Amino acid sequence: MAERDLSKRIVYRVDGMRDVRVRRDVVYKHDAGAELLMNIYAPAGLSGDARVPVVFFVHGGPIAADYMPPTQWGVFVSYGELVAASGLVGVTFNHRLFALTDYERARSDVAAATEYVRSHAAELNVDADRIALWCFSGGGPLMTSMLRDRPGYVRCLLAFYAYLQPAEAQLRSKGAGLPIFIARAGLDQPLINETIDRFVREALAGNAMLDCMNHPAGRHGFDILDDDERSREIIARAVAFAQVHVRRSDR
């Protein structure tokens, strides 16, 4: 089997993606001798007192501990550039989902990443109270954790071709008013799509604020693998969804 090409970028582009400001290899957490790193993508030309909403990109897994860090993958480099060129701050970061037994540790890493950015809001030009989490693939359970905890600074959640845990109770209570965007790949593994379909049914039963887009011919990773209009439409709609909901004032 051919090795995965980790340099592949998303198939959707906007002007200015290469002009954004990037802080690379920022240490957001020390733990057991490990340094966990993030990259922070900001719009070009921000004034010193600017406060911009932020999108965190939560990679999937499990991935081997010695694998290329997700912050270096083309998909997350280009997503960071995309949201920064679209007027938001993008944060990509490495978390430690190395095995299926690591979800609690990965959750603590996600919490540490958000806390680092929020506690350095002035330095990073971010609005600490306007955050979106965008999860991918095996990172989906980290999104359903946010539905359970519902911190007030999280304004919306997005998930692309993600394994999603049952969330009926959360969607009927704390998560009912939290905007959620789901992107489904029609040619994905049946197990993954079964979890997405169940989540969508639960969200609708709970009258959640849900947007769901399906790519009928899309593969797992359609945003880098399938260079077609439907892939570009879904990515563009997801960015627009984040732009709208992180700036909403009715919460």
Regions found by a protein language model. Name each.
Residues 1-50:
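N-terminal cap/lid segment of alpha/beta-hydrolase-fold proteins
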Residues 46-51, 60-102:
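Short substrate-entry loop that stabilizes the transition state in hydrolases
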Residues 52, 58, 160, 215-218:
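Alpha/beta-hydrolase
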Residues 58-60, 184:
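The conserved beta1-alpha1 loop
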Residues 94, 134-136, 158-161, 183, ...:
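Alpha/beta-hydrolase-fold catalytic nucleophile elbow
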Residues 112-173:
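Primarily recognizes the serine-hydrolase "nucleophile elbow" in alpha/beta-hydrolase
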Residues 156-206:
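The feature captures the conserved acid-bearing segment of alpha/beta-hydrolase catalytic domains
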Residues 183, 197-200, 204-251:
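C-terminal catalytic histidine-bearing segment of alpha/beta-hydrolase fold enzymes
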